[in-house]
């Protein structure tokens, strides 16, 4: 879940080939995610046991977040879209609240993953944003949504 303790910033140590700082992610599960994970593992195990399997590898909740199992999944979040700048980084057109000429398109705009591949919604939002840039922003550069 999105919260103020999960964020991206510029790494003070690591740089790319052009000398620019790399993006750094600070993220870990909070108590609510731990509770959800424990509950989900228990429900999964109860369902599996009710099927009387000959072998069962019981599900367990993770204690710390690690990127390793997510190398081929659909990560989301980072620059969340929303109705106002207090709760989000981007408006509904994926335009930055702070810098009106910055549009950020991708799965980063979702607060969390709903457990489905976000490619379809990301594509739809890309068209939505491109249409707003072409038909509104280029004609009158500035915020597309009042803050």
For each predicted feature, which ranges?
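FAD-dependent oxidoreductase catalytic-site/capping-region signature
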Residues: 1-103, 108-110, 130-147
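A conserved FAD-binding loop/helix module that cradles the flavin
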Residues: 112-133
